[in-house]
Amino acid sequence: MKKVFIKTYGCQMNEYDSDKMSDVLNAAEGLVPTDTPEDADVILFNTCSVREKAQEKVFSELGRVKALKALKPDLVVGVGGCVASQEGASIVARAPYVDVVFGPQTLHRLPDLIAARRRTGRSQVDVSFPEIEKFDHLPPARVDGASAYVSIMEGCSKYCSYCVVPYTRGEEVSRPFDDVLAEVAGLAEQGVREVTLLGQNVNAYIGKMGDTSERADFALLLEYVAEIPGIERIRYTTSHPKEFSSRLIEAYATNPKLVDHLHLPVQHGSDRILMAMKRGYTVLEYKSSIRKLRAIRPNISIATDFIVGFPGETDADFAKTMDLIHEIGYDTSFSFIYSPRPGTPAANLHDDTPQAVKLERLKHLQATIEENVARISQGMVGSVQRILVEGPSRKDPTELHGRTENNRVVNFALPDLPQVRREQLIGQMLDVRIVHAFPHSLRGEVAEERMASAAH
């Protein structure tokens, strides 16, 4: 049986795309996934260009595969994702043993690219942007668990000054409304209970409705997804504050399946820096959206992104970021030191802040966020949380683990329940009382009223 090894870098969109690569190759050639590159007939790197030195990391990985390729001449080596879009044919020029190079929008063409490579003996490169075509050529999703990702759109048209995504994934293109609903319904029929809707900027979704000229916005899509039988939770990522509309905020009042957790990247707490980043909103506008949302959902947890050390960032600018963190009380963040991306406007900005200062700022920011996380977790002790049971606990396979609405892992034991019954709980919703908070997880006990029903 032929096998494919896929190494994924970056965001959840890439995780989704990697799953689709696997699905495409399974449908076309019967390839099955493997975690061991030495056992693979096809090795793919799904790359991310958001962070610094992304290209170097790719070529470092390719260097390690070169020796394997020498031992297995028929091994197919491919590079996909955003670095592939950015570098294109130059990847093959630098590493001639790479067989296929493809972008996020052309992953559905993988079988054809591999076949062309075998037929012609020449490396194949396709990093074009055929809009939403790829979704029309993907096989039905294969379910692994009670949670699944569903991509609703591709690309981004915001052109923040530091971001390479519009250049690597293209402009915003929304999937047709009916196509998204059909995919979610198909997943629900296979036992999926929680869907995460994906896009570089899901708020910008504007999907074509059937054969009409009407378009559905993101709030309407959420409303219809919630009506699909079997779907009990809805998450989404990533959203842009500029388009966090009043209709979307109102959806939290009318749609109980929307979880009490939101990832809303702010990037900075200084209006001056936000303007330089070309984010399109002020700190006050951002805080206003959070205030309106919390008026509807007081317990909603907010996650975010921060860029530290953007060119021109002063101590006063950074202090404003810290003020915002204290005011909002963020529950986790993805925070990084700014790194210039080639071809973006911000790469030309003068940057005179010492690296040591940037590192100290990042350390301070992350420590503060960790304090928030610990405080919020501790505040959950004694509460009853509804969790989606995901599977056996990683540390103790005789226990189970699940996830709360605010995205925390809860481990719990059911010592009086036979293993067969424990396994039957995977994919189900359970009420669990939180009894202890750890730095990165919670400990729970199944609520007594649910324990009785679980035992039968």
Swiss-Prot record:
Its cofactor is [4Fe-4S] cluster. GO terms for cellular component: cytosol. The keyword RNA-binding does not apply. It catalyses: N(6)-dimethylallyladenosine(37) in tRNA + (sulfur carrier)-SH + AH2 + 2 S-adenosyl-L-methionine = 2-methylsulfanyl-N(6)-dimethylallyladenosine(37) in tRNA + (sulfur carrier)-H + 5'-deoxyadenosine + L-methionine + A + S-adenosyl-L-homocysteine + 2 H(+). It is an enzyme of class 2 (transferase). It is found in: Cytoplasm. The keyword 4Fe-4S applies. Transmembrane segments: none annotated. Residues 2-119 form the MTTase N-terminal domain. It comes from the Bacteria. Keywords: 4Fe-4S, Cytoplasm, Iron, Iron-sulfur, Metal-binding, S-adenosyl-L-methionine, Transferase, tRNA processing. [4Fe-4S] cluster 1 binds at residues 11, 48, 82. [4Fe-4S] cluster 2 binds at residues 156, 160, 163. Residues 142-375 form the Radical SAM core domain. InterPro entries: Elp3/MiaA/NifB-like_rSAM (IPR006638), Methylthiotransferase (IPR005839), Methylthiotransferase_CS (IPR020612), Methylthiotransferase_N (IPR013848), Methylthiotransferase_N_sf (IPR038135), MiaB_methiolase (IPR006463), rSAM (IPR007197), rSAM_horseshoe (IPR023404). Residues 378-448 form the TRAM domain. Binds 2 [4Fe-4S] clusters. One cluster is coordinated with 3 cysteines and an exchangeable S-adenosyl-L-methionine. GO terms for molecular function: 4 iron, 4 sulfur cluster binding; metal ion binding; N6-isopentenyladenosine methylthiotransferase activity. Its EC number is 2.8.4.3. Belongs to the methylthiotransferase family. MiaB subfamily. NCBIfam families: miaB-methiolase, MiaB/RimO family radical SAM methylthiotransferase. Monomer. Catalyzes the methylthiolation of N6-(dimethylallyl)adenosine (i(6)A), leading to the formation of 2-methylthio-N6-(dimethylallyl)adenosine (ms(2)i(6)A) at position 37 in tRNAs that read codons beginning with uridine. This is tRNA-2-methylthio-N(6)-dimethylallyladenosine synthase. It comes from Ralstonia pickettii (strain 12J). The lineage of its organism: Bacteria, Pseudomonadati, Pseudomonadota, Betaproteobacteria, Burkholderiales.
